[in-house]
Every structure is written in structure tokens, then in C-alpha cells.
Amino acid sequence: MEEVRVRFPPSPTGYLHIGGVRTALFNWLFAKQHGGKLILRIEDTDEERSTQASIDGIIEGMQWLGITWDEGPYFQTEFADDHVAAAHRLLESGQAYKCFCTKEALEQKREAAMAEKKSEVGYDGTCRHLTPEQVQDKEAQGIPAVIRFKVPQRQGTLFYDDEVLGRIERAYSDVEDFVIVRSNGKPLYLLCNVVDDIRDRITHIIRGQDHMTNTTRQVLLYEALGAKLPVFAHMPLTLDLKKRKISKRSHGEVVAVQFYRDHGFIPWALCNFLCLLGWNPGTDQEIFSREELIQAFSLSRMSRVNSVFNFKPGDEKFFTDPKLIAINEHYLRSMDLAELGVLVRKELEEEDLWDAAYAADKEPWYLHTLGLIRDRFHTLKDFATAGRAYFADQYAIDPKP
């Protein structure tokens, strides 16, 4: 039986996003359930925006959450030669061609097509039928060129079977010849992604529905490169109450993993919450241990409709989704006291409230106190703020007016 191999390919151009973590989590669960492997691949081809700080944030965030990978991290830029070689193979086999159309010319054609209310405003194939002599002439003139994939001019539809959405079809005539290599010679994401997945022997691609336009094109690339098509599963997106995709631009730090780390959330509580955004076990159960979730997870239970992140900016009580706060409270109140003691210690140390005796002769008192007060708190931070009186040597009480 073929080994299950999935991947999480974040782009290191910013913080680790909870949407990205949800993707990593679902891939991790699927790999664990099937005895497979999760590959971490950093897609760092955007050299201007990629940063080492973002790479560190991705790795540290996943480690904090306990989402472990079996191979990697690999870096996409390390395999640039593979991507270029694949593009040349497609050129040589006649499945791709050089396009010398300028951006200005393409924009003029697009605007004209829109003005005439044409149904198709994509690339019109101007350079598709250039003769070798015409190509050589343009190259001799120093005219820059991109490389476009030559979409087969077939009747009917291209399709793939999606594990979440079922059979996905699109007419060949609706897919324009798309760019796979920029005029500077650098291959685009569409091609790089496929080449890397083929090399890494990826069997299942579990990702958001916002990638579906890419998938249609990538199906053609798999075929052209003579590779077996992986199984696709497109997850629903996570939107806010106004049906907007959650993002830092619209929602601020609340969508960053670091926000929850800084605010004293228990790592698995965040994972537990995220798995419920777009997936359900078919029962009323909402609290899962790692082992329970690995056993219960199934792509067949993935929702086809978008999930909602219930966040209201400016709400001081519910500074994130209330369900996430409730799940975190559950873990605070039910986890082993010794384990809780380790987590709270970090918070007390940050506030200079930690006493070394709490790990020695005062440990029974320390753990007993945590057991008495934990039902009042929402996050680990609360032990060092609202619970400060229990651990401070001196604590001033404001007199009532």
C-alpha cells in the first residue's frame, strides 16, 4: 500500500496565521491517522518579502502547538534548478511556448474585451502559434518573454475528484494559456508547487478552497509532466461575521498564532478549536485529546461551506472567538495540576512572582492553590494578573470608596 505523504507549504512573508495552522493541523491529523508523513516545505521564492524572522516564527509556532513534521523543513529556493528544468521540458515537448506580449498590450486587449462585453477576457493566444523563426527573430531583438503553458485545445471538460467537494469540472475552453515562468527566468508558484510535490512524492493535497483555480491548472501540469495526480481535498475557508476572509489587514494580531501564545492560551486548546472550524465529528463532542482527534478525524466529515470565526473588534470581554476562550477554560480546569503548574510557572516568572520554593517544599501549597483558583480564570495570564494576590509578597488592596 502506498505511503500517505502530505505537506504544509507556508510562505515566509509574515507571521504564522491561524488559517495556516488549521491547514497544517488537518494535514498532520491525516498523516497520523494513516501512518504517513507530513513534510514541511517553506515556499520562499518571493525573495523580496521572505524573511528569516518569518521562517523562525513558522517553525517556533508549529513546535509550540505540537504539530510535528517528519521531513524538512525544505526550502523551495533550494530546488530552483528542478523548476527551470521542468519548464524547459515543457518547452521542448511543445507543451509550453514563449510569449512576447507586453503588459501594456495585454492590458489594452483586456480593456477592449471588457468594453465589448466579451465573455472571455483572458489571454487570446497571440504567441501560441509563432514559428521557430519568429521566436528567434524576437529573441534577437532582445524582446523579453514569459513562458506560457499551452492548454490542450480539447472538447469537453477537465476534472478531478475532490475528497471534500466531489467531482470538480471545468471546460478546457475556459482555461487560458497561463504563465509558468516570468520574463526574468524565474518559474511561478503554479509550476514550482507541482514540481516539488512530484519530487516529494505527495499523495494527498489538503488545502483551502481559495486554491481551486490553481488546482485546475496544476492538474494539467501533472499530466504534461507525466506524473500521477495526487488526491485533492479543498477545505472551506474561515470568514468573519461579515463574511470576509480573516486576515491581519482586516482583523489585526488576533489571527496570528503569536497572539494566543502571548495571551496565555494552552497550545492544544487552540488546535482543538481550529479543528472545529470546517470539520465536525458527527456528534456533539467538541473537546478532543490528541489521540481522540487523530482517531476521529476524517475528510468525509469536512464541511463544504465556509466556517465563521466569531470575532468582534473592540469587545474587551471576548477578545477572540468566545468558543476558543471556553475551550481554553476547559483545559485550564481539567488538566493535570502538575502540568498546569509548569505552564503557570512561566507566567509567574515573567511577572517576577515565581518563588523557587514553589518547586520544592512549597510545591504542595502551590499546586493546591492552583486547583482552588483555576476555575475563575480564562487564560494562563490570569494567574499572574487576576491571581497576583496569591503569589506576590506584597499586594496592595484598593480601599472601597
Question: What kind of region is each of these model predictions?
Answer:
Residues K98, T102-H234, L239-R249, A256-V257:
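Active-site cores that bind ATP or allylic diphosphates and position pyrophosphate for catalysis
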Residues V84, S93-Q95, R128, P152, ...:
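Residue patterns forming the tRNA-binding/recognition surfaces of aminoacyl-tRNA synthetases
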Residues M1-E116, T213-A227, A269:
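N-terminal Rossmann-like or analogous alpha/beta NTP/dinucleotide-binding catalytic cores
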Residues G226-I397:
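Catalytic adenosine-cofactor/nucleotide-binding cores of aminoacyl-tRNA synthetases and other
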Residues S50, F75-F79, Q95-K98, K150, ...:
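Catalytic cores of large soluble enzymes that bind and process phosphate-bearing ligands
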Residues I55, A80, V84, K103-L106, ...:
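Alpha-helix initiation and N-capping motif
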Residues F8-P12, I42-D44, V195, R199, ...:
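Short, histidine-centered active-site or binding-site loop motifs used for metal coordination
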Residues T13, G20-V21, E47, F79, ...:
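Short capping/connector residues at structural and topological boundaries
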